[in-house]
From Swiss-Prot:
It holds the Pfam family SlyX. The lineage of its organism: Bacteria, Pseudomonadati, Pseudomonadota, Gammaproteobacteria, Lysobacterales. This is Protein SlyX homolog. Belongs to the SlyX family. It comes from Xylella fastidiosa (strain 9a5c). InterPro entries: SlyX.
């Protein structure tokens, strides 16, 4: 009877260990996916920042061109 109880405890511990190992495995997979998504998001953010910098630079050039060579400058309003 004592051996049967020990075997039942061993089975319960083994089942619990398997459950915990399974959870850890899923968490590791989720962590890998989150890490990959974060890396991709950082790349997209860096590309967007570079694009924004470029667009602001181009906008500045357009503004300078418009102020240097006004086309049909409107008359002053008093």
């Amino acid at each position: 009877m004592h051996e049967e109880l020990l075997t039942l405890c061993d089975c319960a511990f083994e089942a619990r260990l398997i459950e915990l190992e399974t959870r850890v495995s899923f968490q590791e997979q989720a962590l890998t996916e989150i890490s990959e998504a974060l890396a991709e998001t950082r790349l997209i953010g860096a590309r967007n920042a570079e694009l924004m910098r470029h667009l602001l630079e181009e906008l500045g050039k357009v503004r300078n061109t418009l102020y240097e060579h006004p086309i049909d400058e409107p008359p002053p309003h008093y």
